Design a protein with these regions (language model features):
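Basic nucleic-acid-binding interfaces
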Residues: 2-99
Length: 99
């Protein structure tokens, strides 16, 4: 099941890393490879790879996609740190929003 196949309650349980311009960035604990983060924007849901900063699943409108990719590029090291913490089920660190 892709991102759209997950139960809405699963998304509520994901730690929030950041929120900006109506977008909510989250990450699951013990999630599957490749390393990635989840984006919610209104009714849209998507998964973006940390390395590629390309969508792995779901959809975002083009402007939102560009903004999330820009944010991801600026905070890639912090995303990797949170991915590592999530693998250890340790508390995740908040990341600054896009300014």
């Amino acid at each position: 099941a892709g991102v759209l196949g997950r139960n809405w309650l699963d998304y509520l349980a994901m730690p929030e890393l950041c929120r900006f311009l109506g977008m909510i960035i989250t990450m699951y604990y013990d999630d599957h490879a490749p390393p990635h983060f989840h984006i919610r924007y209104g009714d849209y849901k998507a998964i973006m790879g940390i390395d590629s900063l390309m969508l792995l699943d779901g959809y975002l409108p083009p402007r939102a996609l560009g903004l999330v990719a820009e944010w991801g590029a600026l905070h890639r090291d912090e995303l990797w740190e949170d991915w590592s913490l999530a693998e250890q089920r340790a508390p995740l660190k908040k990341i600054k929003p896009l300014e």
